[in-house]
Amino acid sequence: MRSNSFPALRWVSLFLILAAVAVITLQLVSFSRLGTNFPAGMEIAEVPVGGLDRATSAQRLLEAYSTTPVELHYGEEIILLTPASAEFELDLEAMLAAADQNRSQQPFWTGFWNYLWRRTAAPVSIPLIASFSESRLEAYLENEIAQRYDQPPIPPLPAVGTVNFHPGTQGTALNINRSVDLVDTALRSPSRRVVDLPLAKTNPPKPSIGNLEIMLKQIVDLAEFDGLVGLYLADLQTGEEINFAYSQGEDFSTNPDVAFTSASIIKIPIMVSAYRRLDEDPDSETTRLIEEMIVKSGNDPADWLMERVIDPFTGPLDVTADMQTLGLENTFLAGEFYPGAPLLAAFQTPANLRTDINTDPDIYNQTTPSDIGMLMEDIYQCTQRGEGNLLAVFPDEFTQAECQSMINYLGNNDLGLLIEAGVPDGTPVAHKHGWVTYFGVMNTLGDAGIVYTPGGNYVLSIFINHQDQLIWEPASELVATMSEATYNYFNQVTR
């Protein structure tokens, strides 16, 4: 019985051995065929290529990187950027060679053993090797996107019939440098290929200064003022200017400018001439005289200051000489203020020799809107950087601190009318106003100052004249309204 079963057992064992050999042989053949493919778990440039051959892997990489566009979002707009637009190129040969090298480094029988036991090898990742043209990408972003989708800001526009401007609108501009970095990152990823383009808000510029000039003349027209308005404005940031003489829809030349009675505004040149001659801080009496002359508009303090600091006999002429040296040829003071003061000289200027227009200016004191405005500019420039015309013409005779003291005195002239009435409460205004009545009749009114605002500082000098009579209320309101329009020009609302 035992002798009959033993051969059967041997045959069964032999069969099992042969079967095992056959299975192993089949697995070996199968594994050998897989040897031409990349191992399971391998990635090239984040693209899974495990079990794929070289050609199929290359196709997968091309589909992921070279065929699939990058989706660019410009606000609500969607733009598809093909990698070729940036000359993006995969170095397939280098990446596949690196993958081949990694595969060949694994021992055959170790791999076969892992294959038999279905063990997954440690994942292998081959990094991306690619290049693109930064200049081509920049050109694409500039020409195809920025030029097409950027929105320029819209400047504020005058609101006809008012002193206001319609708010300007911000624009948008593509940040190209930052966009290049973001698109570069997206081009190098097979899955994160959406880019929200970085946009910068661009603030609208101020309207052209010509728009302000038109508005100021419209204000005169709407007020139905039938006299003459002389105005000088200087943007202290840009140097842009407005200078006009305007009456009943007609523009008069400002070369030379129009001569007006300067009245108390001539006290600004007096103060400048006094400070030119002060070698140190003024004593208490000089300080009192300057303050009463500027802040209280005292005439006697003006005379006493000239006699004390400038010259007891020729003070007015010395003030005039200083102004002419500064190039202000239409500004003069021909005598002191006290009643009956002698006329020390008869001045003829390009402004008062005009025959086309005549404001009947006082023979004792005259200026023009541009002359006094430019003098205010000179003082301002001296305070800012210790430079400007004052220091150029009179070197070592003015200091930055002295110029600031002059501004401080003018800033304490708190009238609350004219230029000051046109700006918000608390706005610093360094100014001097002036008018004269003859037998109870006022013909000329003026105000000149520096206005300090969040949107920029400026000089504004306004003179108005009427041959018959200026009525205070409409005349002062006209100056205030032009001042308000100017403030609004420099301080725009943006939406």
PLM feature segments, named:
Residues 56, 60, 136-140, 178, ...:
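Extracytoplasmic/secreted proteins, especially bacterial periplasmic and envelope-associated proteins
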Residues 62-66, 104, 142-146, 184, ...:
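Sec-exported extracytoplasmic/periplasmic mature domains
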Residues 42-50, 121-131, 165-174, 202-207, ...:
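Second-shell loop/turn segments in exported
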Residues 1-246, 251-254:
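Surface-exposed, secretory/extracytoplasmic low-complexity segments enriched in Ser/Thr/Asn/Gly/Pro
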Residues 234-237, 245-247, 274, 294-297, ...:
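Active-site-proximal beta-strand/loop segments in catalytic clefts of secreted hydrolases
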Residues 211, 226-230, 285-373, 377-381, ...:
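Active-site-adjacent helix/loop patches that line small-molecule binding or acyl-intermediate pockets
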Residues 239, 258-281, 293, 460:
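Active-site SXXK
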